[in-house]
Amino acid sequence: MPHLPLASFRPPLWGLRPSWGLARPRALCTQPEPHGSPVSRRNREAKQKRLREKQAALEAGLAEKSKTPAVPTKAWSHKEVVLYEIPTRPGEKKDVSGPLPPAYSPQYVEAAWYQWWVREGFFKPEYQARLPQATGETFSMCIPPPNVTGSLHIGHALTVAIQDAFVRWHRMRGDRVLWIPGSDHAGIATQAVVEKQLWRERRVRRHELSREDFLRAVWQWKQEKGGEIYEQLCALGASLDWDRECFTMDAGSSAAVTEAFVRLYDLGLLYRNRQLVNWSCTLRSAISDIEVESRPLPGRTVLRLPGCPIPVSFGLLVSIAFPVDGDPGTEIVVGTTRPETLPGDVAVAVHPDDPRYTHLHGRQLRHPLTGQHLPLITDTTVQPHVGTGAVKVTPAHSPADAEMGTRHGLTPLSVIAEDGTMTSLCGDWLQGLHRFVAREKIMCTLRERGLFRGLQEHPMVLPICSRSGDVVEYLLKSQWFVRCQEMGDRAAKAVESGALELWPSFHQKSWQHWFAHIGDWCVSRQLWWGHQIPAYRVGGEKAEDDREECWVVGRSEAEARAAAAKQTGRPEAELTLERDPDVLDTWFSSALFPFSALGWPQETPDLARFYPLTLLETGSDLLTFWVGRMVMLGTQLTGQLPFSKVLLHSMVRDRQGRKMSKSLGNVLDPRDIISGQELQVLQAKLRDGNLDQGELAVAAAAQKKDFPYGIPECGTDALRFALCSHGILGGDLHLSVSEVLNYRHFCNKLWNALRFILRALGDDFVPQPAEKVTPSSPMDAWILSRLAFAANECERGFLSRELSLVTHTLYHFWLHNLCDVYLEAVKPVLSSAPCPPGPPQVLFSCADVGLRLLAPLMPFLAEELWQRLPPRQGGSMAPSICVAPYPSGHSLVSRGQESWRQPELEHCFSRVQEIVQALRALRATYQLTRARPHVLLQSSDPGEQGLVQPFLEPLGVLSHCGAVGFLPPGAAAPSGWALAPLGDTIKIYMELQGLVDPQSQLPRLAARRQKLQKQLDDLLNRTVSDGPAERQQRISSLQLELSKLDQAASHLQQLMEEAPDAREL
């Protein structure tokens, strides 16, 4: 489009005239009669009467309300639900031949589209390769497989919203896109939930069933919950290729897990050993670090734990005396928060440079319970300034003590059993007792023997099993471990070299720290649900203990038998093999997901075409537990990084800042926000879950506080837009339902805008090709420039992975540029006869391009509205907006390849908008609700006057004023006009004579001034909690408002003085 001089935009309908389209006499029909006339007097008296009646009714109502308890006001009102009721078979295209309903209704908009998208194959890479805009590039990504432990929550919805936005954008660009759906079997989590369900419904414990019967119950539960999760993904609009769906326990995944285990074992990267592991006594299984919740305790805290008959106090430091052998009266006092592990102590340690104990180096101490000799050892890891500077050493139940024990050759004593009771090594008096019951008995014994030296509150961090709520113990167990040092070094170097990009980049520090301190990974779990370990114990081989047992690994029992024969030198027929009953850590199979989902270990076409993945997007909390392990195993097993880019988003937390967790009961089902839900139903869902009574009470109370009136229906598009609108790459995301509701109102605004546009275009409108669209006015040029700017910003946001930039840009364009400005300004033009051809073409371009820009974020609403637009002349319209070309700034051009973007024009109009805001403020000050006063602008800068000149008519329309003209520089201010200076160069005059009643307005302004002055005085005379900058800003704002009121009062006083006396008339 040629960049014409601004003065050239002077078509008839946009020239300098008193009003849009038709000349208007000075006495406008919307103006009141002159002050003092009989009509004006009667109107004023009637108005005053109505105000008195209204005030009396209000006072009566307040008096009545004071007699009854106050009821909180609802924060939202129910919207009318419109349903799509045209018979449409699943997979058929929705009927859009009828008119749009009068208001936006999510249920109407979201009906039928998803099934049609899936049936048409729009989500398949094979379809996208045939698109006209096909780039030949590949974009592949996998969904972080959600656990089949229930329904998805808002944290999952955030992941889906972000991933689907990128997937849809790449698809519309023309890339060949594959987004792989899947779900995770979630070993411990699923087994724990099913065990609770079995007990609640059948009063049956897992060990009362056979392994086969229990697994049958889990598979049945999975079929129910797995389907629910996929329904949620569809409701969220996730454009996944469902033909490639996988589950981490299906046949293909099982084959991949077995192959990975065998290969790692053959390479010496997987071994069996007896080491300390995180142990859940309730689950009777080792658990992963991510399932250990570190709960800080400020001091004494009483907890009730599963399986423990008494409440237990934590956050207490117990001081215990260890007598020095052979030196009566000499003792070393040791502080501990774990007196129940005292029977497992094998030494006491002090720092070698601590002068308090130098004379006791090498001495023996007496165990306070058994009287056995314990060595006093010195170790530099002991902190002499903490407590007494002496610590007890329990290598079998503390990771730090285990390392110290290894350094000093100490033999560990396991005194806590798998079920959390005390072992036989503790003696008959403690054996079989629950460990925390034993704690109390040990304390009593210490008091009786005179070796108890005190009890004090002590801040501490308590490890809690997130799956059971029990305190995590550290137990010595024979388990399978993956050697991680070598693989971890490669993963660290991949980020350091730039081969693997982490975004935001600040996560690199956590990544490098984790791999620098990585230990071997315990991958075995004492469960029934999961991938059974493909390892076999060879029977008949002599072994002193489990550490000397003979184990072999194989893809099948036959392969394992052959390996056992080779290892033992015995014939296969004589061998007895017993398969390890344990299963693998869920994270092991999850770490294989990027390539097992594509068919690995088979050389499939999908693996060749889409691996490595283009991008991994997930929550920042999974950086090490999932992302790090995928990188380690992917690089080791495939020879390639599983992906080259990782995008980590913030965490969604509840009102108390806690992570969303099903065990806490603080999760929100996205469908409840999409469709709305009553409080009673929300509470019923909690009761139907697997929470114990304590958790249920806490969750129900929090839910009632957060949603006293339930949750309003917001729709999928509003939820997705709200989730993506946050700066997802920084701190935690605290999402409120009221925020989502605000974006539902934004959807309604879009809906009304398209209804207006479609009516304005009419049935016979034929849109021109985009390159033939040329503006016929400055306003046309401005909105097209804003549209091109929006396209540029959206592209920049997607490329820079800042979806909040995309949402902000689209919200601003649709609401503030198109709806608030252009549509209002163009209404008089569209209603004129004949209507110029330019504005309808511009309107169509705004709708077409604007909806395509919006489609990755609001797919349902964009599809519903875009399908109703007529196809462009001479072009083949895409069957769906989700495969239509995504606009970019450089693609929005007119004839001659001139860009729609005109920054200079936008700068000019920004000045016009400032004038509009000043005029609206003036109208509000003088309460000119219906009158359309004339306006004069006086500028000392001729250049600035030339910039504003082309926009005089839309300026009047947007400010709700009448004719707008210019007052020559230096000319005297007109009498009876209000003044609003705008900077140093422009003065704005607005007509007041005959439009306002000074006698009624002056008291109102005086009351308003008195109120603001009181606020200012209070602010100046009191100390506030706000910072100095906020306080000064508030003071300046009040002072400016007071100045404006004084100026308005002065103008009104001048009007009264200049007005003729009624007695002279």
From Swiss-Prot:
Pfam families: Anticodon_1 (PF08264), tRNA-synt_1 (PF00133). Residues 1-15 form a transit peptide. Residues 42-52 have a biased composition (Basic and acidic residues). It is found in: Mitochondrion. Its main location: mitochondrion. The keyword RNA-binding does not apply. One of its GO terms (molecular function) is ATP binding. This is Valine--tRNA ligase, mitochondrial. The gene is Vars2.
